[in-house]
Amino acid sequence: MPPNTPDASDARPPQADTETHSHSESENPVIESPKPKAHAPLTNQDWWPDQVDVSRLHKQPIEGNPLGAGFNYAEEFQKLDVEALRADMLELMTSSQDWWPRDYGTYAGLFIRMSWHAAGTYRIFDGRGGAGQGAQRFAPINSWPDNVSLDKARRLLWPIKQKYGNKISWADLIIFAGNVALESAGFKTFGFAFGRQDIWEPEEILWGQEDTWLGTDKRYGGTNDSTNRELANPYGATTMGLIYVNPEGPEGKPDPLAAAHDIRETFGRMAMNDEETAALIVGGHTLGKTHGPGPGDLVGPEPEAAPIEQQGLGWKCAFGSGKGSDTITSGLEVVWTTTPTKWSNSYLEILYGYEWELTKSPGDAWQFEAKDAEAIIPDPFGGPPRKPTMLVTDISMRVDPIYGPITRRWLEHPEELNEAFAKAWYKLLHRDMGPISRYLGPWIPEPQLWQDPVPDVDHPLVDEQDIAALKEKLLDSGLSVQQLVKTAWSAAASFRGTDKRGGANGGRLRLQPQRNWEVNEPSELDKALPVLERIAQDFNASASDGKKISLADLIVLGGSAAIEKAARDGGYEVKVHFVAGRTDASQENTDVDSFAVLEPRADGFRNFVRPGDKAPLEQLLVDKAYFLNLTAPEMTVLVGGLRALNTNHGGSKHGVFTANPGALSNDFFVNLLDMSTEWKPSETAENVYEGRDRRTGQTRWTATANDLVFGSNSVLRAVAEVYAQEDNKAKMIEDFVAAWVKVMNNDRFDLD
């Protein structure tokens, strides 16, 4: 091997004559992409595309779950012999199947890619994607061009799933396979947790506005400058149908420095910093190979477009045998190391041990080959050895001014790479699972900062007598019903059901960055939080038997007490269910940058939107309800109740359709549906509507789209009518309380 060279700046190739195929794609740069076809008959959404789609609040209905409403995965998992499962996985790793032969005598590389591509869809801006629900089994992810051949990987797992049945979910099995694959190669992983529950139909996620695979124009606003462009939110990939980036470079232009720009942005949107990103690429490419021995036009349609007789398998290949050495997965033909089945530092030794020149794979895809190199790379099926090769994105790890110093350090200190990759891999596989309280199994390591850790309960909890006394103190504290309700909502409404982050547990409303979020009205928190802290301190100092109440619990209890009072003021007696057990996190255990992405752009429940945001308010309201795991009726009754309670952001009166603000009632619905009121856009205020008496023209109310959507949208109006009925006044109160408790407890996974 030639001696290490200090620089690889010549790895940036000339840009002339390097245009790739217009249909080029990662893990499939030469396979023609499918063309979406108009369907018939048209749906309501096709006819009225601007109408808010409430149906997204009712995805994954229990009726579609063959295991039924009573199935408890955590309980079923306890019956699993995890060591036996691991042993069977290790045996499978080296048990070649004639219908899909293993490379180098192992499926490790294939399983690592499967797990990575399942987890790698996660994105931080909205918490969508990830491996937590086994979504790789369904469209569109199962047919993305980046996932060619992963249908075979999942099919290889079927005998394992069939054997262990309900004790292991597909979501867990897909991820566990990659972890075991690394261990089979001699790598010591950081840990592993089970606990992912399967979904039973595709998720409705906006992966991009482009209508063809590999499109990039919509997410970048049409710019062609690959070194100075900004990916639109919330997308996590540069290209439609890819997990991260095109390995040939942006839009198939083989420029390692431009590729590094894309890598940094996309991995950052998966919550990975530069060192974690470099570790994942270096470690992930230490094992296995890519597949591109022939032209991509010999590869058939993806699973969702494949004929019925292929039984869910796609990409049938007509090149040679179509499998083994004739497998076409990416069009790229790269083996990174001399030890593709064993963990080693060979990747970095080869990356820095040669100069690299641009070439084309047998599948006509851009890649790099080592200059003046001997054929030292083993063939996966016993053929002649090969020269070292790398992807465009591999060269990025050397020439980029940030990644370069990191990987050079690891070249000299491989033990640092081992630790960095172990932790980054663990984070990749578990980032979307939420708090560690959701984790199952015997291999769970100590909590990490990115898991938003909260302390364990280390004291006796308050009982019913304590709760009653604390409610009295809260109502006598000088804080209004509105202050108590708004503080509790601010704490709990940070929750995201997508990646199970946020919520009231941890009491992080008092910490940065949440304390200064505009939506939380920091000046109001400065009034409310010190009062609540004093009540908690006084109780904890005087309570017997070591009982304590956390500020997180007291904030929620304050909301409960306020709602009970508001219901009494409206003529109804209710009890708001409360279960203590939350604890208070510290600022040092709160990653400010990580929490920043949880800050809402809008919260229609508080009639708040960031100034200048042009998105339709009613769409943002439904999105917020989706994050809070709410149904359409729950969203409806919460908005109506919160308006009656007069808890809008900044004290706004928009939507407060009642003569008795602060009392819990169904007045919002009664007055919204009153046909003696005529609504028109305000001539003086943006995004505001005025409700005028049809006879006199006098202004009765003001509202935003967050309010009027419940009279405009036919689905939501149907629900609003129920709550406006004379015989459903009490039902409205009861349903509001139930929905409120659901929001307060969204992050109480210990109660499940």
Curated annotation (Swiss-Prot):
Cross-link (Tryptophyl-tyrosyl-methioninium (Trp-Tyr) (with M-270)): W116-Y244
Organism domain of life: Bacteria
Reactions catalysed according to its record: H2O2 + AH2 = A + 2 H2O; 2 H2O2 = O2 + 2 H2O
Keywords from the UniProt entry: Heme, Hydrogen peroxide, Iron, Metal-binding, Oxidoreductase, Peroxidase
SUPFAM superfamilies cross-referenced by the UniProt entry: Heme-dependent peroxidases
GO molecular-function term, one example from the UniProt record: catalase activity
Disulfide bond positions: none
Modification comment: Formation of the three residue Trp-Tyr-Met cross-link is important for the catalase, but not the peroxidase activity of the enzyme.
Comment on bound cofactor: Binds 1 heme b (iron(II)-protoporphyrin IX) group per dimer.
PROSITE patterns found in the cross-reference section: PEROXIDASE_1, PEROXIDASE_2, PEROXIDASE_4
Cofactor: heme b
GO biological process, one term: cellular response to hydrogen peroxide
Sequence segments annotated as region (Disordered): 1-45
Signal peptide: none
Record-listed E.C. numbers: 1.11.1.21
Amino acids binding heme b: H285
Residues forming the catalytic site: H117 (proton acceptor)
GO cellular component terms, A-Z: cytosol
NCBIfam families: cat_per_HPI, PRK15061.1
Family classification: Belongs to the peroxidase family. Peroxidase/catalase subfamily.
Record's function text: Bifunctional enzyme with both catalase and broad-spectrum peroxidase activity. May play a role in the intracellular survival of mycobacteria.
Assembly mode: Homodimer or homotetramer.
Protein name per Swiss-Prot or TrEMBL: Catalase-peroxidase 1
Source lineage: Bacteria, Bacillati, Actinomycetota, Actinomycetes, Mycobacteriales
Gene name of the encoded protein: katG1
